[in-house]
């Protein structure tokens, strides 16, 4: 006897199982992973999204919650499983999984614990999606992007870190607040390490092509009477403040990652400050990943924009690189 489906629908052709052209996987369904997933879904960037985690109940719950909202989304396939088989043929894989820093734990110890986690995750991604681009979001992001690059064996254009994309967004927001404008009209770059030693490029800060350093030669320095350097100080401190208030950060980084994903799945060739391998640039001699303005396309990271940095900005970048290398060179089993 025919089912309701058989009575309702007359098949015309066989569905192709490999029809997805822009599948995205998110590894880790914590606060950050889900913010990334929801931001990607709401921006309608993919026809297929896969979620992976070791916590099966949480994973199933998050998937069900999203599926119950399918009517309001335009992503026909939302899947979740602890088996990486469901991630097969992803174009972009977002890695948010990792250990959290415990009270009193050294950064090196945290990184080493994350190395051990990544040694399980990354080979699975490579196995099922050998042509994907990996966006590393887990912290400390610059070091874990290096770790991912080493473990994956991928070319450096297909392993990026979310890096200073968020730092720069925070910088532009705070700059906009000070000027009474929208962040999209305020241009400025934060480069280097995602975190305490990031480098604000005051020489390039502008609105409508008007360089703020031309209007205020002391901008960003200790001599500046308007205290613009506080803008960068707030960028560095903002994550700590949000964590103190709500326990974690997730929405801004989720939106930031969706923006990076869009540039790649739509082949936009937009420029973003993301973490890339900087050996050979600005006099940096070690294999470290730092944020520079990078062009993102369907092939991953295809170009780096050579900014005309001032000597003190280059010195800060090199110092960032040295700090990271001192941790990386101590890592075991890479």
Curated annotation (Swiss-Prot):
Query: Pathway listed for it?
Result: Fermentation; pyruvate fermentation to lactate; (S)-lactate from pyruvate: step 1/1
PROSITE patterns for the chain: L_LDH
Keyword NAD attributed = yes
Where are the active-site residues found?
194 (proton acceptor)
Q: Which GO terms describe its biological process?
A: lactate metabolic process
Q: What is its EC number?
A: 1.1.1.27
Keyword terms of this UniProt record:
Cytoplasm, NAD, Oxidoreductase
Q: Which GO terms describe its molecular function?
A: L-lactate dehydrogenase activity
Q: Which domain of life is it from?
A: Eukaryota
Q: Where is substrate bound in this sequence?
A: 107, 139, 170, 249
Kindly list the cysteine pairs connected by disulfide bridges. none
- Pfam families xref list: Ldh_1_C, Ldh_1_N
CDD domains in the record, alphabetically? LDH_1 (cd05293)
The record's Gene Ontology cellular component field reads: cytoplasm
- Reaction catalyzed: (S)-lactate + NAD(+) = pyruvate + NADH + H(+)
Q: Which residues does NAD(+) bind? A: 30-58, 100, 139
Indicate where this protein resides in the cell: Cytoplasm
Against HAMAP family, the record matches this protein to:
Lactate_dehydrog
Quaternary structure, per UniProt, is: Homotetramer.
Function per UniProt: Interconverts simultaneously and stereospecifically pyruvate and lactate with concomitant interconversion of NADH and NAD(+).
Q: Which family does it belong to?
A: Belongs to the LDH/MDH superfamily. LDH family.
Name by which UniProt lists this protein: L-lactate dehydrogenase B chain
Q: Which organism is it from?
A: Squalus acanthias
Q: What is the lineage of its organism?
A: Eukaryota, Metazoa, Chordata, Craniata, Vertebrata
């Amino acid at each position: 006897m025919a089912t309701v489906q058989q009575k309702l629908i007359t098949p015309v052709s066989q569905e192709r199982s490999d029809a997805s052209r822009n599948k995205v996987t998110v590894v880790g369904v914590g606060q950050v992973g889900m913010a990334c997933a929801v931001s990607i879904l709401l921006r309608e960037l993919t026809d297929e999204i896969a979620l992976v985690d070791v916590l099966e109940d949480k994973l199933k719950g998050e998937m069900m919650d999203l599926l119950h909202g399918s009517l309001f989304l335009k992503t026909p396939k939302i899947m979740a499983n602890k088996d990486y088989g469901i991630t097969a043929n992803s174009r972009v894989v977002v890695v948010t999984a990792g250990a959290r820093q415990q009270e009193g734990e050294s950064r090196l110890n945290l990184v080493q614990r994350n190395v051990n986690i990544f040694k399980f995750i990354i080979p699975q991604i490579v196995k099922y999606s050998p042509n994907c681009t990996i966006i590393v979001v887990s912290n400390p992001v610059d070091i874990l992007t290096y770790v991912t690059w080493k473990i994956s064996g991928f070319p450096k254009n297909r392993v990026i870190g979310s890096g200073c994309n968020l730092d720069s967004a925070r910088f532009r927001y705070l700059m906009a607040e000070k000027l009474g404008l929208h962040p999209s009209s305020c241009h400025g770059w934060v480069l280097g390490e995602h975190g305490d030693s990031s480098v604000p490029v005051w020489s390039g800060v502008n609105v409508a092509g008007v360089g703020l350093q031309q209007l205020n030669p002391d901008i960003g320095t200790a001599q500046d009477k308007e205290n613009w350097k506080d803008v960068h100080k707030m960028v560095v401190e903002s994550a700590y403040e949000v964590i103190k208030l709500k326990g974690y950060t997730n929405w801004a980084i989720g939106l930031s990652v969706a923006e990076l994903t869009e540039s790649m799945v739509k082949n936009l060739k937009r420029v973003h400050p993301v973490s890339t391998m900087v050996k050979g640039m600005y006099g940096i001699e070690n294999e470290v990943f730092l944020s520079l303005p990078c062009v993102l396309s369907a092939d991953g990271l295809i170009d780096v924009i050579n900014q005309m940095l001032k000597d003190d900005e280059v010195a800060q970048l090199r110092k960032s690189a040295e700090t990271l290398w001192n941790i990386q060179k101590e890592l075991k089993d890479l």
